[in-house]
Amino acid sequence: MLRLSLSPTYSLGFHLLAMMTLLISHVDHITAETEMVEEGNETGECTGSYYCKKGVILPIWEPQDPSFGDKIARATVYFVAMVYMFLGVSIIADRFMSSIEVITSQEKEITIKKPNGETTKTTVRIWNETVSNLTLMALGSSAPEILLSVIEVCGHNFTAGDLGPSTIVGSAAFNMFIIIALCVYVVPDGETRKIKHLRVFFVTAAWSIFAYTWLYIILSVISPGVVEVWEGLLTFFFFPICVVFAWVADRRLLFYKYVYKRYRAGKQRGMIIEHEGDRPSSKTEIEMDGKVVNSHVENFLDGALVLEVDERDQDDEEARREMARILKELKQKHPEKEIEQLIELANYQVLSQQQKSRAFYRIQATRLMTGAGNILKRHAADQARKAVSMHEVNTEVAENDPVSKIFFEQGTYQCLENCGTVALTIIRRGGDLTNTVFVDFRTEDGTANAGSDYEFTEGTVVFKPGETQKEIRVGIIDDDIFEEDENFLVHLSNVKVSSEASEDGILEANHISTLACLGSPSTATVTIFDDDHAGIFTFEEPVTHVSESIGIMEVKVLRTSGARGNVIVPYKTIEGTARGGGEDFEDTCGELEFQNDEIVKTISVKVIDDEEYEKNKTFFLEIGEPRLVEMSEKKALLLNELGGFTITGKHLYGQPVLRKVHARDHPIPSTVITIADEYDDKQPLTSKEEEERRIAELGRPILGEHTKLEVIIEESYEFKSTVDKLIKKTNLALVVGTNSWREQFIEAITVSAGEDDDDDECGEEKLPSCFDYVMHFLTVFWKVLFAFVPPTEYWNGWACFIVSILMIGLLTAFIGDLASHFGCTIGLKDSVTAVVFVALGTSVPDTFASKVAATQDQYADASIGNVTGSNAVNVFLGIGVAWSIAAIYHAANGEQFKVSPGTLAFSVTLFTIFAFINVGVLLYRRRPEIGGELGGPRTAKLLTSCLFVLLWLLYIFFSSLEAYCHIKGF
């Protein structure tokens, strides 16, 4: 289970913080100090008030002056209610972030037309990543703080309050110090995480510090204590200016304006990735939404000057090899697992390694906290089940098909010339088996002729009720003439149906199309092999492709143009680019022995499966000269079979006869007789002997056209298909989004297991822990309530976006009232309550999200890179919008919008100083001795984390002292 595991230093710090805050808040009451310090706070209030004001929604809890016991009870109720509201905000923010992920994941398809006329299609995201991070993503993660500031101003007659602005500053401090400290510490020892888009980080960090500096300027320098309309509006308009600057830095549009960019296919899912290069050819054209755009058009695709997709990009190959390696390792590690479990494991590993947005980590953290389970594991399991189910699709004709299909069992048949007849099987499948079905058949000449090679045959086959198979026979004519292999055709036609209800067996032809029809194949090809020759031996084709996962490869050796006699055919494997000896295949050699009338033999070769993603290696299988096993002495003489001989003591045609010696381990168990060259006196043969020699030569077994088969070993088709599916980048909008209300309600009432320390066993189904059940029952009310929010499928996520932000605003109003009443009950000022409790509550989901991102992501951008941008957006939106509305309202009434600069200005200044220290330390950590902003050696991690926690504690400490006038403010 994912938990916010803090070191003893963190735990001690939080305990000291709680004690310190309460101590400071009661110092004035204990010493009965009531003096006013003008410099500390213009309102003259240096102590917390026990007098509560009516909230935006919640009324005052009467009486106003309860007993000490009632105060404790009220404070407990307010605190528990506030925590419960924070849980609700986290859950509705989960829906909100899901809608943002769906919105920012929208893509469009573009077509690239190359100079050679080829076209390539790829997809590009409509939203730029940096723009989405600074707008919708930041709004989603900081919506409670922003809305709290706006609601507080609007709900209190457009007067400035301490809760909203202090929450924004306090949340910024928590994000900048505590979240980054945690991210630095949780990275495993020795590992580092660096910010990938450093220039974007510089821009957002600069704007973040400027935002808080700007607050000090407008509060204490330009118009002390008064916020004018132009100041409020300019604060708000800094938001789009900040976004534009970050976008410019991301797209390199200023300094890099004349550096031409090239886009290549990304590692996953065909997404385009930018890199710099030379000026490309101007002939490349890009078609988007049906419009052709020349490759030199500026500002295309977020400022790109060129789009060029390399279909064989090296990164794609690396991604596939990496995925193949993952699958091989999983198979070796879990040989007992089924394919579904292996695909689930691989899916989860791919999803875990895939780069994710800030929104995803926020959603993942919230669901893990609330017992909703790991969305990556659930999605991986769903995808695995779908993949397996696709393999199990039944392609056979359904038995309940209302139409009967009539067809041959197979499309080709073979027979020997001396077989007499050849049998062909006709199949009836589907339809009403109680009907009688008639089908005509007829032979047709091919290279074989009716009357000389086969008997012309035609007729009608009758399938009686219940019959599903019939056999027809065609006569084959034998002769003693050497012939090539010949073939003829048999056609099916004219299907008719007769039902039991028909009278006198009359055929019902009116409903033939709906009752029965011809299936495939409806024509069979019959090949007649000549049996008057010993045979021509050949492979079926010169080249064959096999999958490396085939195991044992079987290759057919055909015997055509005759099948008389027993023949031996030697064979052997020959290395090519594929190596034998068990590396790519096992060396094989031997002999095939064809019996009389046997026309097919198979050679078996073992292929080694080493599970390479792309494989194209070759070896050869070769057959040698065939030879007859049994041969008469005279035929052996006439064929002049040469070899090693021993003297037999016999004479033939006046010549000594020798026995041939075969150089084989297992000689043929027969005697082959011939005459040695040295005994051949070149005596001419008679005409009769010449004729006998010619006839013997005609019947001799010979090699055919394909004697050397090239075997190309390719990657496993199933393995490659699995890899191709896995390397396609899963759109995370599909993972976090929902398609229906039914799906949302099922998720709301389902308890799922959270994260485990052992991710290697993620394929095993685990039961929810006790913590999962506790968090589920604590949050089930919110889950069911917010299941009514429209699914992200509607309006491309905008329906969910609008409803969610309204719900967040409503809950934020409750949180503001509860926090204010909690503070006044125990005597805390709103500024202190906001900086400590409210800021902490609104930042907990971000803390979990950053922790997950720091441990799982390859870079530090998702964990800390967005912190600075989020801090700037909080000021420009949260304070800019609220103060602009209030300033305009007061200006319209001829009044001034007054804001006390004391506490806020002091907090802002303190935060700015500490933020400079924070950013400086992070940049220093990029030096080679540490290697990155996050992680590194254990000592460096611990020192950095302790420093950042100390900065936060000092910020809280000094802000509280200033709020209670113990130190001089501005």
Swiss-Prot record:
Residues that, per the record, bind Ca(2+) 6: 584, 610-612
Membrane topology qualifier: Multi-pass membrane protein
Glycosylation sites: 41, 157
Signal sequence residues: 1-32
Side of membrane Extracellular, spans: 33-71, 155-167, 223-228, 819-821, 893-903, 963-970
Top-level taxon of the source organism: Eukaryota
Annotated compartments: Cell membrane
One Gene Ontology term from the biological process aspect of the record: calcium ion import across plasma membrane
Keywords: Antiport, Calcium, Calcium transport, Calmodulin-binding, Cell membrane, Glycoprotein, Ion transport, Membrane, Metal-binding, Phosphoprotein, Repeat, Signal, Sodium, Sodium transport, Transmembrane, Transmembrane helix, Transport
Residues the record lists as Phosphoserine modifications: 282, 389
Substrates-to-products reaction catalysed: Ca(2+)(in) + 3 Na(+)(out) = Ca(2+)(out) + 3 Na(+)(in)
Cytoplasmic-facing ranges: 93-133, 189-201, 250-797, 843-871, 925-941
Amino-acid positions noted as binding Ca(2+) 3 in the UniProt annotation, renumbered to this chain: 417, 479, 481, 483, 530, 532
Gene3D superfamilies cross-referenced by the UniProt entry: 2.60.40.2030, NCX, central ion-binding region
Residue sites binding Ca(2+) 4 per the record: 453, 479, 483, 486
Alpha- repeat boundaries on the chain: 138-178, 839-875
Segments traversing the membrane: 72-92, 134-154, 168-188, 202-222, 229-249, 798-818, 822-842, 872-892, 904-924, 942-962
Ranges of residues in domain Calx-beta: 393-493, 524-624
Residues that, per the record, bind Ca(2+) 5: 548, 610, 612, 715
Regulation: Activated by micromolar levels of Ca(2+).
Function, in words: Mediates the exchange of one Ca(2+) ion against three to four Na(+) ions across the cell membrane, and thereby contributes to the regulation of cytoplasmic Ca(2+) levels and Ca(2+)-dependent cellular processes. Contributes to Ca(2+) transport during excitation-contraction coupling in muscle. In a first phase, voltage-gated channels mediate the rapid increase of cytoplasmic Ca(2+) levels due to release of Ca(2+) stores from the endoplasmic reticulum. SLC8A1 mediates the export of Ca(2+) from the cell during the next phase, so that cytoplasmic Ca(2+) levels rapidly return to baseline.
Similarity field: Belongs to the Ca(2+):cation antiporter (CaCA) (TC 2.A.19) family. SLC8 subfamily.
The protein's name: Sodium/calcium exchanger 1
Gene, per the UniProt record: SLC8A1
